[in-house]
Curated annotation (Swiss-Prot):
Residues 19-137, 148-288 form the C2 domain. Inhibitory regulator of the Ras-cyclic AMP pathway. May bind inositol tetrakisphosphate (IP4) and phospholipids. It comes from Rattus norvegicus. The modification Phosphoserine is found at S554. A zinc finger (Btk-type) spans 706-742. This is Ras GTPase-activating protein 2.
Amino acid sequence: MAAAAPAAAALTEAPAVPGTAEPETGDEDSREVRVLQSLRGRIYEAKNLLPYLGPNKMRDCFCTINLDQEEVYRTQVVEKSLSPYFSEEFYFEIPRTFQYLSFYVYDKNVLQRDLRIGKVAIKKEDLCSHSGKETWFSLQPIDSNSEVQGKVHLELKLNELITENGTVCQQLVVHIKACHGLPLINGQSCDPYATVSLVGPSRNDQKKTKVKKKTSNPQFNEVFYFEVTRSSSYTRKSQFQVEEEDIEKLEIRIDLWNNENLVQDVFLGEIKVPVNVLRNDSSHQAWYLLQPRDNGNKSSKPDDLGSLLLTLCYTEDYVLPSEYYGPLKALLLKSPDVQPVSASAAYILGEICRDQKDAVLPLVRLLLHHNKLVPFITAVADLDLKDTQDANAIFRGNSLATQCLTEMMKIVGGHYLKVTLKPVLDEICESSKSCEIDPVKLKEGDNVESNKENLYYYVDKVFSAIVGSSVSCPTVMCDIFYSLRQMAAKRFPNNPHVQYSAVSSFVFLRFFAVAILSPHAFHLRPHYPDTQTVRTLTLISKTIQIIGNWGCQSRRKSRFKKSVMCEFLKMFQEERYFTDVKKFLDEISSTETKESSGTSEPVHLKEGEMYKRAQGRTRIGKKNFKKRWFCLTSKELTYHKQQGKDAIYTIPVKNILAVEKLEESSFNKKNMFQVIHTEKTLYIQANNCVEANEWIDMLCRVSRCNHNRLSSFHPSAYLNGNWLCCQETSEGTPGCKPCTAGIPADIQIDIDEDRETERIYSVFTLSLLKLQKMEEACGSIAVYQGPQKEPGYSKFTIEDSVATFKTIQQIKSTIEKLDEPHEKYRKKRSSSAKYGSKENPIVGKIS
């Protein structure tokens, strides 16, 4: 710390970032601030699940992720295990508010409904405390009491009444207005009703609302009246006020129930409001959070059900108007031109963040959007090569360069993977042929030689698809591979093979092999494969890695110690495999190898199973909604009776006029959206809110440049001769609500640069202590040459202490200026969320 003081004298103050303008200091609160939520993490494994009571104690388990009770993600089934190992990563945008993020562990049942073993429920406000940590969570028992969620809007009033015999009493008026976010029952919206009770030491008067059908957000708007008995000592002189001894003993209890016609009604939650809230006021109105029963089921011990290992990272970004991000973007975008690159803002970001992955994804997206990624990766890869002494270890570590390039391949290489691997992966996953070649793992009736032939056939087919795909390799990947190859050859001039291994270590090891191993993660398959197929894909992935590596070496040796794998790999030691690998690597690392510009093949964007409402029908009924397989390309949206069948209906992308959400009240169904096109409006129901959001986003982006897009739309359906939203009778009536703001035509499909810059700002904000440490290290190096006394200083890569110090000062200045509008927005948000409002409901009793 002592070195920091003289550093200020040794290093000059950093100038402002050139080419940027300060945003006007107006009222930014009046402009739109986008609040965007996302969740990523990994479900590792469950342990010590309860066994079956019979002789077969094993279970077939899977895990789901739920926003409250809405399932948004499901793992593969792990068969015959009480400690299933899932090891599945997830990432999704969260398009709505929620109370709990829950993980349910199920036992798969073929003949009956899947059995819920237990769950992990984490309150939204507690998610940040678990961020980035591997944590074991105890599974909790599941019953109606543990599933309580939602809130109630309530109004209480106190009136004075004179009875028929002339006595005076008080009348308590209870207005139950609405509920919001009630739990799902068996995955469906419930049929809720409420009981309203006035409870005291000697009374329990109960009344009941009407049942509302198929909704999680019922609008009751029912009023109930209760007489409050007065004590004999009451006189008119005591004014309009309930006496203290009566107030303290009375409370209003509201219980929510799901109406079950044939079985017992299901408890949904309760609230208790003491009548003394009216002590100082004749009325009280507020939202209350539903609570479980006080005497809930406490018999099951959480530890008895097992535990679940998770890693979670929940982010909530407050994205300001674009002009606020100008200085930070300018600082980041000049990073490729900074000499040395280790003194650039982008490189410093990677140095100081706790988890480099948090910085890499937004950084790659931002640089890619502005065509700055290739020179930046080239510069940081060159820095990696300076520290690499062994040619066999080239680009094998998890440096900033390797992580940036890996993320870039995931972003730009999606279509490349689909056209290259999807056909053969579909064949592998749908054929269910056994490829197990380890005698120890063979199933009864399997033949090793037959399995070996199956595996050879698949590996050869995958290999042929890869080495024949160079024409489809994205240009930006080719440009970076070319740079890597040139730098590797320059660094190790006496090794003719290193230029190939520099490219192979990315395209085979970090791209194709990973996609083969986890096709669902790359959107190559709609569902996770079964256990046998997972094993087949693992063997194929390992073999492809080895062959790709062999093509870059003079000596071809297997790393596998198992003789069965070594014997199998001998089948691929023909010279043609090595020649094909080198030819492929030559083609994708040449500056002349670009994407074919004349291809008319549409880009496959998204597919999945959803429900659509029959077009042209006027009756409301379940049979009007049919399950269909939807497929979106860059040219058209189609739906099919089943996956792989011919299209039943096609909507050209150029004919899409708008894509908007549809109000739940239209068909009493959640997660609906509408595709408005030139012929008719197509109503679609997604399986959950995350899926609906992804489809809406992708459809909006692919049709964003259509010249005939609508400026307004109807948020409800046209049924029985009128629009449900505005009651207009003509189907051609212009929309009654403005369309969602469109995306500017110059923004690339997958990149929201303001959000990516906001993410980078958040990473810098969370890493300020380490940034300060790096600044002190620069000062120490400038003053004291040689080994540094502070051990933490050696962890930083500082080639030019003066240049690095100046950049750090610019970063700190830019972050401080961004802090101001963020703090103003947070204060405004917290002050507007009054306790008892819908956004901030009352929890428990108030007095």
